[in-house]
Every structure is written in C-alpha cells, then in structure tokens.
Amino acid sequence: MFFFNPEHDLCLANGDINFMPPASALKFGHDCASLLEDVYADSANICHNQNIMVWGWNPSIRNRLKKAGIAESHLPSFTDLNNIKKLQHRRTALEGLKFIRSSVQQCNYLVCNSPMELFSAKDAEEFIRNNPGTTMLKAPLSGSGKGLRWTNSSSISHSDIGWCRQTIAKQGSVMAEIKEEVVQDFAMLFHIDTDGNIDFLGYSLFNTNNGAYTSNVLASDDFILKTLSRYIPANVIREVRNSVTKFLQTNIKGDYTGFIGADMFICKGSAGT
C-alpha cells in the first residue's frame, strides 16, 4: 500500500500522535492521490497483507494507520521513528555538506558559505548582524518551504528574535545561512534496502519560490543532467552523487530503510557566474 502524506514534515516536527495538520496540507495530499492511480488506497480500503510505503513516517501517520486496523508488525517502532526524526534534522544535511566538501576534488564548484546551527536567540542575532544583506533562518525540522525566516542585518525585528526563541524552545536550535542567488533546484534520489545496499534512483528537477516548492519538471535523467551541466560540469555532479552515496553508507546505513532524497541547488558565484 502506498500512502502519500505530504504533511509529513509538519507532523514529524510536532511529534504528537494526535496532531492535525493544516487543512491546506491535507488537501494537497488528497488532490495528488490520483497520481498513484491503482496503487493508492485510503484508510477504508487498506490491504492488510501488503507492505506499507508512506511518503514519510511520523507518530501521527503511525497512529492513523493503527486506528485504521494496521497491525503493529507492519508499523515502525517508536525507536524507528526517533531515528527518522534524527536523520531528517537539518543537522544531517550540514554533516553531509561537510562530508562532500572533504571528498569532492573539484570543490571550487561548491559554495563557500556553510550553514550554522545556533542554540540561542543571541547567537542568531549576532549571525544576522555579522552577515550584511539577506540571511535565512530555518527550523531544524521542517521542509517544503515551511519553517523558513528571511532576515536582514539592517532591519532585525523583535518578531525575528521572537521566532528564534520560539523555534529553539520547540526544536532545540535554529539553522542559519547566507542567502544565495539560486538559479536551479534539483535533488538526487536514493534507496537503501534491508541489506544496507544503496542504489541511486535518479535526479529530480524542480522549482521553488523563496524556498517554497512550486513545481516539478518530469523528464529523463539524461535531460536533467544536460540541464544542470549548463551551469556545472556533468562530471562534478556525478562526483557529488558518489560522495552522497558514500555519506549514506557511512552515516545512514543500518538506521534507515527506504527512499532518501538529497535536495540541492545551483547558485550564482561571487563573480555572477
């Protein structure tokens, strides 16, 4: 059974088994359900003998499926859910970026600015003040354009600092980074099986608006790689892909089974190239 729950990020961040996502998030999942065609099943037509494949596991979806009659043996344990929450933390992406920088030979194509994890509103305010121009603050557990806060060193508001305090109180930290001028968003998609084997499944080409997802381009890997290589040599993209695979083998294998997407973007360099 395939279960599309795009509200997953919100549910994972909240952590409550009874959390009810916003109506807009639930509507998006319902509207896109038809894309799964024959493999889609709602809670009224669950096949109890099939493996369950959800968009993302969290306490809320586990509780919903359990109430619908799914046996515990088909559901992840709370230990599994804690591992997923740990892996989906933006700290994992930061560790991945550091790993890629240390292993990719043509690192001159990688951005120089590194995101930082900050643990106090004071540190966040100092980060904003010390980086002229636009900066972005992110909730550690968030996705799809949610949990983002654009800030500027020339106009720090009480609301900005309040957002930091609230996010840190709920999630323990905030991620901070300097705004880059993005020219193309994309992702690399992988799968880890029960034996720990990692397969590269392909590329994803998509568009965003101020960090929020807007649309995907449905195309072959060859087309996507050709599109990306207008900005970055294809061999560099492949080298990054191999580095991500090694990072997954070193840091993720054994703690997670299923699909993994690594979001990336190509941005303009300091010289405008």
Where are these regions (language model features)?
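ATP-dependent carboxylate/phosphate-activation module, predominantly the ATP-grasp catalytic core
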Residues: F190-F247
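N-terminal-proximal low-complexity accessory segments that begin disordered
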Residues: M1-E37
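Conserved metal-phosphate-binding beta-hairpin within the catalytic cores
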Residues: L248-T273
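Phosphate-binding site of ATP-dependent enzymes
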Residues: H158-Y213, F265-T273
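Conserved N-proximal alpha/beta basic substrate-recognition cap immediately N-terminal to
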Residues: A25-P132, S142-G143
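Glycine-rich phosphate-binding loop of ATP-grasp-fold ATP-dependent ligases
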Residues: T135-I161, A187, N210-L228
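ATP-grasp fold ATP-binding core
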Residues: I128-T151, R165-V182, A262
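Structural motif
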Residues: F3-H8, W55-S60, K179
